[in-house]
Amino acid sequence: DPYRHRTPDAILAECKRNIEVYGANYIDFWDDLSFHSLRSTEQLVDAIIGSDLRFYWTAAIRADLFGNPKIVEERRITIAHKLREAGCVNIGFSLESSNAEILEMMNKKVELEYFNESVRILRLAGLSLSTAVVFGYPTETPQTIRETFDQCAKNAIYPSIGILIPLPYTEMYEYAKEHGYITDEDNYLTNMTERQDLCLNMTQMSDEEFMNCIQEGASALNEQLGLGLNDLIKTGKQPAHKGSKLTRNQNDFSFNYAEATFHEK
C-alpha cells in the first residue's frame, strides 16, 4: 500500500490526545517516514514549537536526513537545533554495518559517510544519539565485525546489537531457504526468538566464533567509551514457543519493538 503522509496538524492532534487522555509526557516517533525530508521535519518541529504542547520525544530517521552533504550545512544545523528546541532528546538512525558488500546485500542505499556526518551535525545541537547494527549476513567475517565496531568507536556511539533474523517474505528469508540454511520452516519460525539471539547462522564461522567476535568487539567498545556496561548485547533470552504446532497464514507475523499499554484516566 502507498505511504499516507500525515500533516503536522494531524500528528499534533494525536500527540495532544495522548497527553490529555493518557497523561503522556514522552512520545516516540517510531516511523522514520515522519521525518522523510528536511522540509517535512522542519514543518513538524515548527508546529510543535508554535503549539502549547510541551513534551519530550525521540525519533527514528534515515542517516541521510542530516548527513547528505549536498544540502547546505547551515540549513542542516539550523533544523537540528530546532529539534532540540521542540523537545527532542534523542535521535536514532541505523549504521547496520560498515562493510560495503554487506550494505549492498541489505539493499541499504545510504552512503557510510552520511552516517558520520549525521552524527557530527546532530551533536552540534546537543542531541543524544542512538544507532543499531546487524551482524550475520553470509559474507560476515571477524574482519567485517571489527570494521563495524571501529566505525562505532570513530563516532563514539554504542549500538544496539542485533543478529540477522530472516523474516518471511523477505529476500534474505528466500536466500536462507534456497541455500539450505532453513530446511524446516515450521521449526525455524516456532523457535525464532528476537534480534539479540542467534537463531540462524548464515556465516562461515561457527556459532561460537561468531558470537565471540561480537562479544569481543562490544567489550572493547564498551571499555574504549568508558560506559561500564555489564550486559553488552542483551538482558536475557526470550523463551521460544513451547506449545503445539502453530497454523499460520500471511497475516500472522507482526513485529513491533515499541509495544505499550495505555489506560484511560
Language model region names:
Residues 171-176, 185-265:
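Radical SAM enzyme core and accessory elements
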